[in-house]
C-alpha cells in the first residue's frame, strides 16, 4: 500500500461551492489520518475550475472549518508549500500545455459539436437503450474517425467554439487495485470520450485533477465511491502521459437511517450546522471517523482521541458497504466527552455565553461569584451528567445564575398543598441556623424535621426544588442548594412563598 521510498502525500480537494459537507469532512479526515499515521503530508487543493458554481467566501469557510476540526494542512492556498499554486484557477497555462501535448500525441482531438447536437444524440441513444456517450462525429480520420482533419482546421480558423476530448482506445480493459475494494476492471466500450478542456478555456475536473495529482506528487488518492466511474478516464490519462498513477481508495457512501443517500432533505449535512448546534470538535471527529472505519473484530472501544485515531487508523479496516449516519450516536459521543472533559475547558466555553446572558438580564446573585471558576466548577460537576451540549450548562442550568421569575405550573399543582406554606415556614429557621450549609447537613436537617411528624421527605423536597429552581427536575436537591448557597436559597424560598398561591 505504501509506495516504497516515497514520502506519503494525501490531499483533500474540495470545490468552493458552499459549506463543507459531512461527507467531505470524512474524506478530509481519512486523508489526514492516513498521512499522519505514515508520517506524511496532508494537503488542501481548491478545485475551482467550474466558475459558474463558485461561491464567494466558500474557500475561506472550507479551510476555516477544517482547521476547527483539527485538520490543519501542511500545504494549502493559505499555508503555501513547494507544489503551488493550490488553486486550480491559477494553473490554467499549465493545463493548456499538457492538453497541447495530448493533441500532438494523437490522444485528444477538437470537438465542435453544439450543445443541441449533443442533446439530440443523447436522446437518440437513450431511445435505443444505449448508454449515452459522444458519437465521435468530430474524431479525425487519422485517429480512427470519419471527419477529415481539414474540417477541424477550417473550424479552428473560423474561430468556432470547441472543446477538447480525450480519445479512449477501443477494445481495451482498464484495471486497477483499490485499497478498500480490491481489483476493479472497466471495459473501454463503456467509457466516453471525456471533455478535457471546455470552450471557456478551463479544464474539466477529470483533466486538472490528474495533472495536479501527478505534479503535486500525491501517493494516495482517498475519495468517495462516487468517483469510481471516473477511474478509467483518469487511469487512461496517466497512461497517455506515461506517468505512474497513485494508489486509490474509494470510501463507502454515507447513508440516512433508511439507507437512502445522505442529503439535506432528511437533516443537516453541513458541518457548520453541527458546529452551530454546539457539537464539539472531539465528538464530531470521533463520530465521522467511525462512519466507515472500525478498529477490528473484538474491539469495543468507541471513544477515540485524535492521537488514538492517527495511531490506529488503516485503510484496510474501511468497509465497502454504505455507512449509516445516526444522530443518536453523535449525541451519545457528545455526552461521553462532556462527562470526561476537564471543568477548566468547559469554563472557557460557557463563561462568554454566561456573560452574554448576564448583559441582558438582571440577577440577584453576585455576578463576580457566579462567573468565577469555583462556582462554575461546582455547577459543571453537578450538571455534567444531565446536559448534552456545553451551552446547556447555561441554558438548562439557568437557575444557578438567575432568580426564578416563574414557577412550573404543573409542578405547583401536583406538589404544593395547603400544608406546604406552614411546613416551609417552620423549616426555614432550621436552614438559617445550620452551622454548615452543605448537602449532607441539609439532608440530615430535612429528615430530622419530617420524621417526628410522620411525614416523608418528599413533602419538602419537591416544594423546595420548585422554589429554588422554578422547575420540577434537576440534580440532587441537597447538592443544588449547597451550590446556590444559604443566602440565595433563603431569599428564593421567601420570594416564592409570597408569589405561589395554594391551588383551589
From Swiss-Prot:
- Name the residue ranges of motif: 'KMSKS' region: 261-265
What does the UniProt keyword field contain?
Aminoacyl-tRNA synthetase, ATP-binding, Cytoplasm, Ligase, Nucleotide-binding, Protein biosynthesis
Record family assignment: Belongs to the class-I aminoacyl-tRNA synthetase family. Glutamate--tRNA ligase type 1 subfamily.
What InterPro entries does its record include? aa-tRNA-synth_I_cd-bd (IPR045462), aa-tRNA-synth_I_codon-bd_sub2 (IPR020751), aa-tRNA-synth_I_CS (IPR001412), aa_tRNA-synth_I_cd-bd_sf (IPR008925), Glu-tRNA-ligase_bac/mito (IPR004527), Glu/Gln-tRNA-synth (IPR000924), Glu/Gln-tRNA-synth_Ib_cat-dom (IPR020058), GluQ/Sye (IPR049940)
Protein name according to UniProt: Glutamate--tRNA ligase
One GO CC annotation: cytoplasm
Q: Which NCBIfam families match?
A: gltX_bact
Q: What class of enzyme is it?
A: ligase
Amino acid at each position: 500500500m505504501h509506495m516504497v521510498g516515497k514520502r506519503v502525500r494525501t490531499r483533500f480537494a474540495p470545490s468552493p461551492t458552499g459549506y463543507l459537507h459531512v461527507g467531505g469532512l470524512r474524506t478530509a479526515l481519512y486523508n489526514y489520518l492516513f498521512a499522519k499515521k505514515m508520517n506524511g503530508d496532508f494537503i488542501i487543493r481548491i478545485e475551482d475550475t467550474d466558475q459558474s458554481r463558485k461561491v464567494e467566501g466558500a474557500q475561506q469557510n472550507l479551510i476555516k472549518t477544517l482547521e476547527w476540526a483539527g485538520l490543519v494542512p501542511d500545504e494549502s492556498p493559505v499555508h503555501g508549500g513547494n507544489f503551488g499554486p493550490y488553486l486550480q484557477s491559477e494553473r490554467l497555462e499549465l493545463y493548456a500545455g499538457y492538453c497541447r501535448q495530448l493533441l500532438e500525441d494523437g490522444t485528444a482531438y477538437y470537438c465542435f459539436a453544439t450543445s443541441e447536437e449533443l442533446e439530440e444524440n443523447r436522446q437518440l441513444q437513450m431511445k435505443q437503450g444505449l448508454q449515452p456517450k459522444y458519437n465521435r462525429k468530430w474524431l479525425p480520420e487519422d485517429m480512427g474517425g470519419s471527419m477529415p482533419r481539414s474540417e477541424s482546421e477550417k473550424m479552428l480558423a473560423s474561430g468556432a467554439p470547441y472543446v477538447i476530448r480525450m480519445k479512449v482506445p477501443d477494445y481495451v480493459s482498464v484495471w486497477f487495485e483499490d485499497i478498500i475494494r480490491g481489483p476493479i476492471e472497466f471495459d473501454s466500450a463503456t467509457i466516453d470520450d471525456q471533455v478535457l478542456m471546455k470552450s471557456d478555456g478551463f479544464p474539466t475536473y477529470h483533466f486538472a485533477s490528474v495533472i495536479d495529482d501527478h505534479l503535486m506528487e500525491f501517493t494516495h488518492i482517498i475519495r468517495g465511491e462516487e468517483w469510481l466511474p471516473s477511474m478509467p478516464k483518469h487511469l487512461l490519462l496517466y497512461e497517455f502521459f506515461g506517468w505512474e498513477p497513485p494508489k486509490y481508495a474509494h470510501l463507502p457512501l454515507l447513508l440516512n437511517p433508511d439507507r437512502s443517500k445522505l442529503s439535506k432533505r432528511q437533516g443537516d449535512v453541513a458541518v457548520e450546522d453541527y458546529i452551530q448546534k454546539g457539537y464539539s470538535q472531539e465528538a464530531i471527529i470521533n463520530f465521522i471517523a467511525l462512519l466507515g472505519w472500525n478498529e477490528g473484530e473484538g474491539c469495543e472501544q468507541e471513544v477515540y482521541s485524535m492521537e488514538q485515531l492517527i495511531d490506529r487508523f488503516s485503510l484496510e479496516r474501511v468497509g465497502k458497504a454504505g455507512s449509516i449516519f445516526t444522530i443518536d450516536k453523535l449525541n451519545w459521543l457528545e455526552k461521553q466527552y462532556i462527562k470526561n472533559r476537564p471543568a477548566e475547558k468547559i469554563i472557557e466555553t460557557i463563561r462568554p455565553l454566561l456573560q452574554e446572558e448576564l448583559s441582558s438580564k438582571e440577577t440577584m446573585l453576585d455576578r463576580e461569584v457566579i462567573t468565577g471558576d469555583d462556582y462554575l466548577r461546582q455547577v459543571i460537576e453537578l450538571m455534567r451528567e444531565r446536559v448534552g451540549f456545553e451551552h446547556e450548562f447555561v441554558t438548562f442550568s439557568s437557575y444557578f445564575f438567575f432568580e426564578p421569575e416563574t414557577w412550573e405550573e404543573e409542578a405547583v399543582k401536583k406538589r404544593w398543598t395547603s400544608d406546604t406554606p406552614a411546613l416551609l415556614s417552620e423549616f426555614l429557621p432550621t436552614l438559617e441556623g445550620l452551622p454548615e450549609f452543605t448537602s449532607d447537613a441539609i439532608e440530615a436537617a430535612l429528615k430530622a424535621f419530617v420524621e417526628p411528624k410522620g411525614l416523608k421527605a418528599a413533602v419538602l423536597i419537591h416544594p423546595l426544588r420548585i422554589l429554588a429552581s422554578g422547575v420540577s427536575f434537576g440534580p440532587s436537591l441537597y447538592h443544588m442548594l449547597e451550590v446556590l448557597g444559604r443566602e440565595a436559597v433563603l431569599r428564593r424560598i421567601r420570594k416564592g412563598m409570597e408569589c405561589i398561591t395554594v391551588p383551589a
